[in-house]
Amino acid sequence: MGDQSIISALLLGIIEGLTEFIPVSSTAHVLLAGHFLGFKSPGNTFAVLIQLGAILAILLVYFQKLVSIAVAMPTSAKARRFVLAVLVAFLPAAVIGALAHDFIKTVLFETPMLICVVLIIGGFILLAVDRMPLKPKYTDIMDYPPSLAFKIGLFQCLAMIPGTSRSGATIVGALLMGTDKRSAAEFSFFLAMPTMLGAFVLDLYKNRDALSFDDSALIAVGFVAAFVSGLFVVRSLLDFVSRRGFAPFAWWRIVIGALGLVALLVIG
């Protein structure tokens, strides 16, 4: 294990944390960065465990709100409806993810060119939706009905295609269904909790025979980097979106996708 491997692990962890909760596709960024850095994950352990760092970041930021919702559930119909809405939104991705896991991981994830193209297409879609004169009917995530949440959950299934972005798909779906930008991003945070935990557990189970902690230092570096950078994003994203919208992320996707295509054609 050399200094170059540690630097690569640090960069990939930072990329995971910074991109996991914004609509630019963390999967695309981590896969493309790993490809061009020539980083070889120890088994599949590194890729699986750095996700846990990002998961813990969002759980920490929203810990008090999660506790308050849990405490209110026995007496508050609003709290119970919100929990139901999150679970209903999670269901489509849970079913499709479990059924198509092997195909997604072994076929779609091995196609960098596809990832770049999807990044660009998704960027233009996000840009178009961000500029639409939408009139939001829902501005508080606690008021999202389960029927709305289910539709958002269907959009989340699009994120099975690498480069789409889980948060991007849910945010676009929420905006088209009548939410405002801030609450769309916040609901995406809450939906990320069961979705990412479920994906983590499934990945861990599927890769149980390949897991290796031989390079535990690399895993630790990536994990901590993902956790710290994830904290920064979760704490600042809602205010950023309220001020700037999603256009900066859309242009970022387009630029990174285009640069990735050029690099793949030139370098391979």
From Swiss-Prot:
Catalytic reaction annotation: di-trans,octa-cis-undecaprenyl diphosphate + H2O = di-trans,octa-cis-undecaprenyl phosphate + phosphate + H(+)
One MF annotation (Gene Ontology) recorded for this entry: undecaprenyl-diphosphatase activity
Chief location of this protein within or outside the cell: membrane
EC numbers, comma separated: 3.6.1.27
Signal peptide residue numbers: none
Cited Pfam families: BacA
Keyword Lipoprotein (UniProt): no
InterPro entries: UppP
One Gene Ontology cellular component annotation held by this UniProt entry: plasma membrane
Key words of the record: Antibiotic resistance, Cell inner membrane, Cell membrane, Cell shape, Cell wall biogenesis/degradation, Hydrolase, Membrane, Peptidoglycan synthesis, Transmembrane, Transmembrane helix
Regions that span the bilayer: 5-25, 43-63, 84-104, 107-127, 184-204, 218-238, 247-267
Top-level EC class as recorded in UniProt: hydrolase
UniProt-listed GO biological process terms: cell wall organization; peptidoglycan biosynthetic process; regulation of cell shape; response to antibiotic
Cell compartments where the protein resides: Cell inner membrane
Topology within the bilayer: Multi-pass membrane protein
NCBIfam families: PRK00281.1-2 (NF001389), PRK00281.1-4 (NF001390), undec_PP_bacA (TIGR00753)
Record function comment: Catalyzes the dephosphorylation of undecaprenyl diphosphate (UPP). Confers resistance to bacitracin.
Similarity field: Belongs to the UppP family.
Misc: Bacitracin is thought to be involved in the inhibition of peptidoglycan synthesis by sequestering undecaprenyl diphosphate, thereby reducing the pool of lipid carrier available.
Protein name: Undecaprenyl-diphosphatase 1
